[in-house]
C-alpha cells in the first residue's frame, strides 16, 4: 500500500505532463473530465501516476472518481493549478505523524496572481472546529483514507464547479467529516503555490453567486438556514454592486430552490416573465 497519493481533479488533459507541472513526489491519481473514457498510467521514480478520463461533468463527481480509485493510507486532495514545494510527501506524512489524532489535516498555501505571491495563507498547528473550518478549500486538505471510507464520506455532486450550484462542495465535505465525528487539524506546513489568475467557473459576486450561496446554507446549516443566509448577506465584504436588500432576497430564493434542486437559470427565467 502506498503511504500517500495526491488526488488531482482536472479537465481536458491528453497526457500525464500535468505531473511535471505540479511537482509532486509521490503517487498520484488524476481524474480528468473530457470527451472520452480511458485510463493511462506511468511508473515514475517516486511512484505511480494514473489518469482516469471520463465524459462526466462536475467537480464533485470528479473528486469522487479519484477518491474511489485511491488505495493509499493518506490522500491529499488537489486542483490542477497547484505547484508543490519540494518535500511534499515527507512533510504531509510528518504532519500526521506529529498529530496522530488527526483524520483530516489542513495545510497552508501561497496564492499567486499575475506571477507574484498575492496572499500567504498560513495556519497554526491546532485542532479545528466546524465554525472555523468552513473557509478551507478542498485543495489544501489531506485525510486518512480509511476514516473517509469507513464513514462512506463522498463529495456532494450538486455543489461546485460544473454543478447546479457554483461552489460549496468543500464546506459540505468538511461538514460531513465533522458530522461523522472525524477530527480536523491544521498544520503550519505550506504545500506550495496556487495560481488564481483565472477560473473556469467563478464569474464574480453576481446574482447567481448569492442565489447559490443561499442554496448552500440549507445544506450547511439545516437547523438555522434563514439566520445564516441573513448573516452572510448582511456581512458580505467582497466587492459587489448588488445592494444588501437584493442579496438577502437572492439568498432566501436560493434557500427555497435548493430544497428542490432548482438552478438559478430557472429562477431568473421566472423572475423575468
Task: Please annotate each region the language model reported.
Residues 75:
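Short aromatic/hydrophobic "clamp" motif used to bind/position activated sugar donors
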Residues 205-214, 218-273:
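Non-catalytic, C-terminal membrane-associated alpha-helical segments of glycosyltransferases
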Residues 54-70:
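Glycine-rich, basic loop-to-helix element that forms the pyrophosphate-binding segment
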Residues 87-120:
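Conserved donor NDP-sugar-binding/catalytic core segment of glycosyltransferases
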Residues 155-157, 181-193, 205-206:
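Catalytic beta-strand/loop signature of glycosyltransferases that borders the donor
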Residues 160-172:
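Acidic donor-binding loop at a coil-to-helix junction in glycosyltransferase catalytic cores
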Residues 116-146:
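Short, flexible, basic/aromatic active-site loop/helix in glycosyltransferases
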Residues 1-29, 40:
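N-proximal low-complexity "stem/linker" segments adjacent to membrane-targeting elements
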Amino acid at each position: 500500500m502506498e503511504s500517500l497519493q495526491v488526488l488531482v481533479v482536472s479537465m481536458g488533459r491528453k497526457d500525464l505532463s500535468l505531473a511535471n507541472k505540479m511537482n509532486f513526489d509521490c503517487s498520484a491519481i488524476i481524474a480528468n473530465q473530457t470527451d472520452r473514457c480511458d485510463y493511462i498510467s506511468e511508473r515514475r521514480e517516486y511512484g505511480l501516476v494514473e489518469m482516469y478520463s471520463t465524459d462526466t461533468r462536475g467537480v464533485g463527481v470528479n473528486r469522487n472518481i479519484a477518491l474511489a480509485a485511491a488505495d493509499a493510507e493518506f490522500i491529499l486532495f488537489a486542483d490542477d493549478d497547484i505547484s508543490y514545494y519540494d518535500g511534499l510527501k515527507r512533510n504531509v506524512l510528518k504532519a500526521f505523524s506529529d498529530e496522530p489524532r488527526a483524520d483530516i489535516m489542513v495545510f497552508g498555501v501561497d496564492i499567486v496572481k499575475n506571477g507574484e505571491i498575492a496572499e500567504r495563507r498560513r495556519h497554526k498547528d491546532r485542532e479545528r472546529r466546524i465554525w472555523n473550518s468552513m473557509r478551507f478549500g478542498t485543495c489544501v486538505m489531506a485525510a486518512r483514507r480509511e476514516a473517509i471510507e469507513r464513514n462512506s464520506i463522498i463529495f456532494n455532486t450538486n455543489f461546485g464547479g460544473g454543478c447546479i450550484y457554483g461552489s460549496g462542495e468543500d464546506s459540505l465535505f468538511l461538514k460531513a467529516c465533522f458530522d461523522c465525528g472525524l477530527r480536523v487539524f491544521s498544520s503550519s506546513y505550506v504545500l506550495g503555490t496556487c495560481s488564481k489568475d483565472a477560473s473556469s467557473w467563478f464569474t464574480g459576486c453576481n446574482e447567481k453567486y448569492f442565489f447559490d450561496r443561499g442554496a448552500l446554507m440549507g445544506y450547511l446549516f439545516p437547523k438555522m438556514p434563514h439566520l445564516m443566509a441573513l448573516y452572510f448577506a448582511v456581512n458580505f465584504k467582497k466587492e459587489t454592486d448588488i445592494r444588501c436588500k437584493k442579496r438577502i432576497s437572492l439568498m432566501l430564493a436560493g434557500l427555497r430552490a435548493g430544497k428542490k434542486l432548482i438552478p438559478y437559470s430557472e429562477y431568473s427565467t421566472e423572475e423575468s416573465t
